[in-house]
Every structure is written in C-alpha cells, then in structure tokens.
Regions:
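Mature, extracytoplasmic segments of signal peptide-bearing proteins
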Residues: 2-15, 22-119
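Right-handed parallel beta-helix/beta-solenoid
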Residues: 118-154, 472
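Short glycine/acidic-rich loop motifs that flank beta-strands on beta-rich extracellular proteins
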Residues: 178-179, 201-211, 242-248, 266-273, ...
C-alpha cells in the first residue's frame, strides 16, 4: 500500500515538472532575444531636407542654406516637408535654426512685407508702422529696381490688381517710360508709401514733354469726394522728371495727400487739375515737399486749378513761376520760393516775367509765405481779393533791377498785414515797389507792414491803402 502511495506521488510531481517546463519554454519564445539585435527589427529611413545654418525671419530659402539627410521616419514631426524642391524659393515666417526641419506653417510664397530680401527689418515693429500688420503690398516682391530696365508696365499691373491697398516701394531707382495712372473710383483707389530714397525717374525714351510720372485719379473719373473713406495718399520718395516730364498730376475727385517727397528736374512739380471751369475737382493737401524745377521758361513748381487745397512747408526753386493758382479758397502756409539765376532764366526779359505767387483766383489765403529774388513776389489778376498775413519779399541781388512786392492787374481789393519787404542791397538804380496797381480805387488795406517808403518808385501805390505808417 505504501509503495502505491509513493509511486502516485512521484508521478504527480513528474507531471507538474513537465507542465512548468512547457510554460517556461512558451514564455521564452515570446521574449526579445538578448545580445546583438543587428539585422532584426530596423525602422524605415527617409531622406529629408533641413537647415544647415541659422536664418532670419523673412529670409529666402536657397540651396546654400539647406542639406539633405537620412533619418528615421518615425522621428519626424507630422507634416514635415521632405523634398527640397518644396522649400527652395520660399520665405520663412519665423526665425529658424541649423538642423531644423521645415513645416508648412514656417514657409510662405512671398516675403513678409516688413523685411527686405536679406531678412532685415524695413520698419521696426514699434506700434506705429508695421508693414506686415498693415497688409502693405511690397512692390519688390514683384519687380526689381536698379536694373536699368523700364518698370512702368510692372508697376501699372500691380496697381490695377491691388485696389484699395497701399503699395510700399523700398529704396532704389525705378525707371519709367510713361505715366503711372491710378483710378478715381473709390473702389479702385490705391495709396503709395515710398522709402525716402525710392527714386522714380523719367527714362531717356520719355517722349511727351510735360506728361507726369504719376497721374493720380486719371481713370474712372467721378465727382464723388464727400465720402469720409475716399482718401488716398502718396508719401515719400524722389520724383525726377529728367527735365522733360512733370512729377505728379492729381485729377478726378477725392481727398488726396502728398507728403514728405522730393521733386526735381520737372517742368511742373505738382498740378491739381479741375474737372470744370468752376474749379471743382480733387482737394489736395501737400505737406513738406521740396521742388526743384527744370529751370526753363515753361517751368512751374505747383499749379492749383481747383478750390480748397492746402500747401504747407514747401521750398520751391528753379521755376519761372513758383506757384500758380486759378482756383479759390486755397490756404498756403510757410512756403518759400527761391529764384535761381541760371540759363535760360538769367535773361533780363525772362527775369521780368518771374513771379513767386501768381494768383488768378477770387480769394486765397497766404500765411508766412516768403520769397527770394523773383521780379514780382505776388501777382493778382483783376478780380482777386486775397489775404496776406506775415508774408515777406526779399532781394539780395541788384541783378536786373526790377523788384515788386505786390502787383495787381486791376484794383487792389486784398488785405496785406504784418508783412515786410526788404531790398538787401544798396543799388540806387533799382526800381522797387511795394504795391503796383492797374486801376485806382480799390478797397484793399495795408496794415502794420515793414518797408522803407523812401526806396519805392513814384509808381508805387501803397500810400493809398495804408491804414498806418509803415515801420522801417
């Protein structure tokens, strides 16, 4: 009996050992083998493009800045761009570093508008101006200055395709063979913001004398100007007429501003054109603009044919007539025309026709307007009754011996007050006049002025309109 119990116990133990051994073998089969794993379980490799140097925000991706490497596909961020052809020529939307992969969100087809082609900031993001936030159109994304090529067509296309946008022109020379035109339609107008050294120049092939470099509001003519949103501007830049072109015409309607620009070598600097004989048309604010004309007998600095314009802080030289007004109710402040004795303007008969302010309007307003060396400072047509406050006429040279401060074609019906005229040389043969009139009997007044009545000629009529003695 005992032998049977022992035999049964042994059999049970042997069965248990066999079962446990099979379980261990099964577990070992499910474990990774230990030791060298080469050639077993390798991950998929891919070729990917990445940066090999740090680059700035807004930089262009070029062949020299990238490299291709092989990496484990599983290690790449989702959406990583693999092919180098998909990144070349793109622009970065953020600063990137060597070894960094390209994601679609980090690239754009066009350069951000507040940086140049080197990734340098054009205007600092200081809360005042930010080209990117403003949505300006960066012109040099579409054309290049300084190439010697005509960019007229390219600029015109850009204007036509970007209504109600502001176009930014960086520094450089933009050669034009014909005028650039903009629309007067409020739905199509554009504004221009120019770097101070963005230089527009008439080419040698410019054929039509006195056509302007820019015609603002020249197409889609309209009489709409009351809308508060109907305003467009031109700011900055240099406009060079090459002694054959005008600089800027303003046409159509609307409220327009021209600021911080330099104009040179032009037949006419700025011409504001009327739509009708009553002077209706655009209303323009010109502020801090310098003009140097072509120095020819047909040269003008500014011509205002419309009403209600404002000219402020301007210096104008090398024109036979600096400013001509046929419109009325214009306000002129702190303007300084200067006559330059250079051929053909240095001819005595030509000089006698020179005028700083030529006024054919019914009434215009002058404040702190002064001129040097023109034969006539202010000329008024027959029906003009303008007002001059704190104005100044000065002659530093006795050349050609004709010095008239104010000349009226007809009667004098204006107001001159707190103004002065001075001959800064001692030539006794010079004919000087404070006021000349074509007809007596006007109702104008001269109040609190500075000039020497002993220096004026017998033709001077100022004594008939003085309400107090001049100071000298």
């Amino acid at each position: 009996m005992k032998k049977n119990i022992f035999r049964n116990t042994v059999c049970i133990l042997l069965c248990l050992l066999m079962l446990s051994g099979g379980f261990l073998v099964s577990c070992n089969k499910n474990e990774e083998p230990s030791g060298d794993n080469s050639g077993a379980g390798t991950e998929e490799k891919v070729t990917v493009v990445r940066l090999k140097e740090n680059i700035k925000y807004g930089s262009k991706v070029t062949e020299a800045k990238i490299e291709e490497v092989q990496v484990n596909k599983a290690d790449l961020p989702e959406g990583t761009i693999l092919n180098k052809d998909d990144v070349l020529g793109k622009f970065t939307t953020t600063e990137m570093y060597a070894g960094e992969y390209f994601l679609p969100v980090k690239l754009a087809d066009k350069r951000p508008t507040n940086v140049d082609e080197n990734g340098d900031t054009v205007v600092e993001d200081d809360g005042i101006i930010n080209f990117l936030d403003a949505g300006y159109v960066m012109v040099t994304d579409y054309l290049k200055p300084d190439t010697g090529a005509d960019v007229s067509e390219a600029i015109q296309k850009l204007i036509d395709e970007n209504p109600n946008r502001t176009l930014y022109f960086p520094d450089g020379v933009y050669l034009l063979s014909k005028p650039i035109t903009t629309s007067a339609d409020p739905a199509k107008t554009v504004s221009f913001k120019l770097s101070n050294f963005a230089h527009f120049k008439a080419m040698d092939t410019w054929e039509t004398r006195s056509e302007p470099l820019f015609k603002l509001g020249a197409t889609d003519m309209t009489d709409e100007f009351a809308s508060a949103t109907y305003h467009y501007s031109l700011e900055g830049g240099i406009f060079d007429g090459s002694d054959k072109a005008d600089a800027i015409w303003v046409m159509g309607a609307g409220n327009v501003s021209i600021r911080y620009s330099s104009i040179k070598n032009t037949v006419v600097g700025i011409h504001v054109k009327a739509n009708d004989a009553e002077g209706n048309g655009p209303t323009v604010d010109v502020h801090t603009v310098n003009i140097v004309g072509s120095g020819t007998v047909d040269s003008y600095g500014v011509i205002l044919d419309t009403n209600d314009n404002t000219l402020t802080n301007m210096r104008i030289a090398s024109n036979l007539i600096a400013i001509k007004l046929t419109g009325s109710e214009n306000f002129l402040r702190n303007l300084h025309p200067l006559f330059i004795f250079e051929a053909p303007l240095n001819n005595v008969e030509v000089y006698k026709q020179s005028v700083a302010f030529y006024d054919e309007g019914k009434q215009n307003f002058y404040d702190n307007c002064y001129n040097d060396q023109f034969a006539t400072g202010f000329y008024f047509s027959k029906d003009t009754a303008s007002i001059m406050d704190c104005c100044f006429n000065y002659w530093y040279s006795e050349k050609y011996a004709v010095h008239n401060s104010y000349v009226c074609e007809g009667q004098f019906n204006g107001i001159i007050r707190y103004s002065s005229s001075d001959v800064g040389h001692a030539d006794k043969g010079t004919e000087c006049n404070f006021l000349l009139v074509g007809e007596a009997g006007g109702k104008g007044t001269i109040d609190t002025v500075y000039f020497n009545p002993e220096k004026v000629s017998e033709n001077d009529a100022s004594k008939d309109y003085l309400i107090n003695n001049p100071i000298y």
